UniProtKB/Swiss-Prot annotation:
Keyword ATP-binding appears in the UniProt entry: no
A GO cellular component annotation in the UniProt record: cytoplasm
Keyword entries, A-Z: Aminopeptidase, Calcium, Cell membrane, Disulfide bond, Glycoprotein, Hydrolase, Membrane, Metal-binding, Metalloprotease, Protease, Signal-anchor, Transmembrane, Transmembrane helix, Zinc
InterPro entries referenced in this protein's UniProt entry, alphabetically: Aminopeptidase_N-like_N (IPR045357), Aminopeptidase_N-like_N_sf (IPR042097), ERAP1-like_C_dom (IPR024571), M1_APN-typ (IPR034016), Peptidase_M1 (IPR001930), Peptidase_M1_aminopeptidases (IPR050344), Peptidase_M1_dom (IPR014782), Peptidase_M4/M1_CTD_sf (IPR027268)
GO BP: any one term: regulation of systemic arterial blood pressure by renin-angiotensin
Species name: Bos taurus (Bovine)
Family affiliation: Belongs to the peptidase M1 family.
Name of this protein: Glutamyl aminopeptidase
Residue numbers marked as site, Binds calcium which modulates its enzyme activity: D223
Low complexity bias (residue ranges): 49-62
Length: 956
């Protein structure tokens, strides 16, 4: 699965800090402010630099979503009523080991017009201990007939009763007599008939719509990870309960059906209905089961080994699937070769779903996508969109091996799926698009952003205990994905690329079609490398956080846990490793790269075996290959700043990005004076590469936002960064030309120039916006987001806002829609922003998948920050009813409050959480928000004067 909301934990973070603390005032005033804040922009907040690179966000299509926002199907308990009976093992969260499914015969019949479906499933089950009870997962879907139970001989066993134990989402079937172990015999058969609803959510089996030639059409598809297969059909919904499947779909003759496997046969049921039956699958986990009923067209490529690779897409968007088809073939062939293992199925399909809750889902043989992540129009989409499509396609292809062929034993090892896919996606795209510098871009999109998250006390280990569906959902986050990818990058560099590849191949071969744990992967890499992989890497996966290496005299190194909050207790929560790490330290001496293993047992630190002396410089952690930060002595930081100014190309672009990110993070943690960090930015007038500029924008956004309301200082800060970015902004200009990285760079630096009030940049954005409003100009694809944002910000009014909304409704390309959504959110008009928030409840206009994106976009607007947060508070019950507390995007939306910095705002956040204590999948985001706001308040107290003096001294 790809996380569509990655912008909440990757790339530039958004911060808007007030310069004046506000005392806590009475609840009456707070309540009034909460309500009034929706109508007027009471508190000026920051425009974010988020989106300067047109990064990961969400999209939609012209088709209205029919999904009702708040209504639920009527309660119908069927023949298995709810019960609170806790006399058996079904009271436990985990399924028992003695009941094992081996095969499912599943038939489903969607009734599109009624928004319902019916189905039946015959599950072949092995029982290894005597029992009268069988229990399996079921949620929201109901059993319509008393289950049928048969012995291996075929003899029917009378069923005494069935009931739902909703606390653990089980349906329990009680037999009249004992079921004996069937070792050596055939399986038991449990047959259940069921019915469910196709509306109300974007999980399980659901229907959504799109428009084709003015006609509204429907598509029904599934989305099951992590615990939603149980919503589609009764099943043993845990990843280690692998079984084979034979799936049949009964559908209207107007439709076609897809599933994991190729079609085995199609037959007519009557004049209206057809039945499509698919070949028996390989053993797979329930969350990978997928089926869809559609009227789409397709584009196909054939792999080097003859596997058909097909993209299914709305007929009117067929041309936008060409790039996806090409990149799929290239990366697919690369991974078959790299992993040394053929893809396991006879075909691989991909389908773009018009309204899809996540970014993409790796269902074996039928990968489902949000349209923004699969479809690319070279005449309408930006370079960032192209890169996003390539990356998501590669990510999901990795899963066909890591996740599908070998699956984690339990969700606590989710990173074995997602960390690996997040790492290997870069290798796949690097092979297909060789000039994109994808291995270096991993620093920008994964390593450095997640280091910020992992420096909070509210972080968690990569391998983490999970014991509820909400906890399972919550670990689909930056730690599992980006930190997982980052430590694999470090590990690959340590043991060498060749041995890492061999270890991966051995791991896949040994555990093919089975489940595995983190220790199994370490064992495979130890065998390949003959290095202590488990001893080293357990310190990175089994405790949260990471170290900062303090360097003394260029050779002597000690480690300490890095935390953004200098007041935090670095020994909490308890860790068996005491927050020390076994660290493969990479360093360069005379252009020679070396690796020294820093064992955590060396409590006094280590000394690098360097022959350099005097003022020589050892670059520790070149290209930020290790998941740690480096803090040099002040004199060394001064030397780095001087040498950047003299000849910045003496350092690689990745090193320049790393220096800047480390320095600003260390300064936030009060481990380095901000003067030293800011001195590193003096050379930027000469910087011409994407990696450093991307990271500069992220690093300085916190400071820019913090002082935005300081009428004395902010203009000085604004002018400084405007002067620094102007040479590269003017050099690149507003002509959308150049290679891929040049186009990404142009969008970034022009965005910063606009943010810093550069008159030339703003005038260009406004002029292009006005020309676009005439309807006679097609904007350059890589400048559209800038024009929509800053054109709307500078010259937007009701007329231009309405025109933009009309264009949003007219365009069919999802990536263009997401840019227009951002433009609509950038208007400096509280009445229009309030109207925009009201539209979020109209699912015919704003798709269910896009609601949280719009809220985030509005929160980036200085006029909308307070409005967006207040709207969430006032509409929380509506949002919970529409999405459920198990929705990870709902859980994360509270992070839009992270920029707050006053005691009053902190109190408001606490009060909101106390009013709605059930967090569901949002428990960690809530902890993160509270910690971040507390840190912001303290940060202002500790750093305002130092930063003020540095900027004022520039003019002194």
């Amino acid at each position: 699965m790809i996380l569509e909301e990655r912008s909440s934990w990757e790339g530039s973070k958004r911060y808007c800090i007030k310069t004046k603390h506000v005392a806590i005032i009475c609840a009456v005033v707070v309540a009034v402010g909460l309500i009034v804040g929706l109508s007027v922009g009471l508190t000026r907040s920051c425009d974010s630099t988020e989106g300067m690179t047109q990064g990961t966000t969400q999209g939609t299509t012209q088709a209205p979503s029919h999904l009702p926002p708040v209504t639920s199907p009527p309660e119908d308990q069927g023949v298995c009523p709810a019960s609170e009976d806790e006399s058996g093992g079904w009271k436990d969260f985990r399924l028992p080991d003695f009941i094992k499914p081996v095969h499912y015969d599943l038939e489903v019949k969607p009734l599109m017009e009624q928004d319902t479906y019916t189905g039946s499933v015959d599950i072949s089950i092995n029982v290894s201990s005597s029992t009268r009870y069988l229990w399996l997962h079921l949620r929201e879907t109901r059993i319509t007939r008393l289950p049928v139970l048969r012995r291996p001989s075929g003899e029917q066993v009378q069923v005494r009763q069935c009931f739902e134990y909703k606390k653990q989402e089980y349906v329990v079937v009680e037999a009249e007599e004992e079921l004996e172990p069937n070792t050596g015999e055939g399986p038991y058969h449990l047959i259940l008939e069921f019915a469910g609803w196709l509306n109300g959510s974007l999980v399980g089996f659901y229907r959504t719509t799109y428009v084709e030639k003015g006609q509204t059409k429907s598509i029904a598809a599934t989305d099951h990870e992590p615990t939603d297969a149980r919503k589609s059909f009764p099943c043993f919904d845990e990843p280690n309960k692998k079984a084979t499947y034979t799936i049949s779909i009964v559908h209207s003759k107007e439709y076609k059906a897809l599933s994991n496997m190729p079609v085995e046969k199609e037959e007519s049921v009557d004049d209206i209905w057809s039945r499509t039956t698919f070949q028996k699958s390989v053993p797979m986990s329930t969350y990978l089961v997928c089926f869809a009923v559609h009227q789409f067209d397709s584009v196909t490529r054939i792999s080097n080994r003859g596997i058909p690779l097909t993209i299914y897409v709305q007929p009117e968007q067929k041309h936008t699937a060409e790039y996806a088809a090409n990149i799929t073939k290239s990366v697919f062939d690369y991974f078959e070769d790299y992993f040394g293992m053929s893809y396991s199925l006879p075909k691989l399909d991909k389908i773009a779903i018009p309204d899809f809750g996540t970014g993409a889902m790796e269902n074996w043989g039928l990968i489902t996508y949000r349209e923004t992540n699969l479809l690319y129009d070279p005449d309408e989409s930006a370079s960032s969109n192209k890169q996003r499509v390539a990356a998501v396609i590669a990510h999901e292809l990795v899963h066909q091996w890591f996740g599908n062929i070998v699956t984690m034993e339990w969700w606590d090892d989710l990173w074995l799926n997602e960390g690996f896919a997040s790492f290997f996606e870069y290798l796949g795209v690097a092979y297909a698009e060789k000039d994109w510098q994808m291995r270096d871009q991993m620093i920008l999109d994964d390593v450095l952003p997640v280091q910020e998250d992992d420096s909070l006390m509210s972080s968690h280990p990569i391998v983490v205990t999970v014991a509820t569906p909400d906890e399972i959902t919550s670990v689909f986050d930056g730690i599992s994905y980006s930190k997982g990818a980052s430590i694999l990058r470090m590990l690959e560099n340590w043991i060498t690329r060749e041995k890492f590849q061999i270890g991966c191949q051995n791991y896949l071969k040994k555990h093919k079609f089975e489940n595995a744990k983190t220790s199994d992967f370490w064992a495979a890499l130890e065998e390949a490398s003959n290095l202590p992989v488990k001893e080293v890497m357990d310190t990175w996966t089994n405790q949260m956080g990471y170290p900062v290496l303090n360097v003394d005299n260029m050779k002597n190194i000690t480690q300490k846990r890095f935390l953004l909050d200098p007041r935090a207790n670095a020994s909490e929560p308890h860790s068996a490793f005491g927050y020390t790490w076994n660290i493969p330290i990479k360093w360069t001496e005379d252009d020679e790269q070396r690796i020294t293993l820093y064992n955590r047992s060396e409590t006094g630190g280590i000394t690098l075996e360097s022959t350099l002396s005097g003022n020589a410089f050892l670059k520790i952690n070149p290209d930020h290959i290790g998941f740690y930060r480096v803090n040099y002595e002040v004199s060394t930081w001064e030397w780095i700043a001087t040498n950047l100014s003299v000849n910045h190309t003496d350092f690689s672009s990745a090193d320049r990005a790393s220096f800047i990110d480390d320095a600003f993070a260390l300064a936030r943690a009060q481990l380095l004076n901000y003067k030293e960090a800011l001195n590193l930015t003096k050379y930027l007038k000469e910087e011409k590469e994407y990696l450093p500029w991307h990271r500069v924008i992220s690093a300085v956004t916190y400071i820019i936002s913090m002082f935005e309301d300081d009428k004395e200082l902010y203009p000085v800060i604004e002018k400084y960064f405007r002067d620094q970015v102007k040479p590269i902004a003017d050099s690149l200009g507003w002509n959308d030309v150049g290679d891929h990285l040049t186009k990404l760079l142009r969008a970034s630096v022009l965005g910063l120039a606009c943010k810093m009030g550069d008159s030339d940049a703003l005038n260009n954005a406004s002029q292009l916006f006005q020309e676009w409003l005439t309807g006679t100009v097609s904007l350059p694809v890589n400048l559209r987001l800038l024009v929509y944002r800053y054109g709307m910000q500078n010259s937007g009014n009701e007329t231009s806002w309405n025109y933009t909304l009309e264009q949003y409704q007219k365009t069919s390309l999802a990536q263009e829609k997401e840019k227009l959504l951002y433009g609509l959110a950038s208007v400096k008009n509280v009445t229009l922003l309030s109207r925009y928030l009201d539209l979020l409840k109209d699912s015919n206009l704003i798709k269910t998948q896009d609601v949280f994106t719009v809220i985030q976009y509005i929160s980036y607007n200085s006029y909308g920050k307070t409005m967006a947060w207040n709207w969430i508070q006032l509409n929380w019950e509506y949002l919970v009813n529409r999405y459920t507390l198990n929705n990870r995007n709902l859980g994360r939306i509270v992070t839009i409050a992270e920029p707050f910095n006053t005691e009053l705002q902190l109190w408001q956040i606490k009060s909101f959480f106390e009013r709605y204590p059930e967090a569901g999948a949002g428990q960690k985001p809530r902890e993160q928000v509270l910690e971040t706001v507390k840190n912001n308040i303290e940060w202002l107290k500790q750093n305002r004067d130092t930063i003020r003096n540095w900027f004022l001294d520039l003019n002194g």
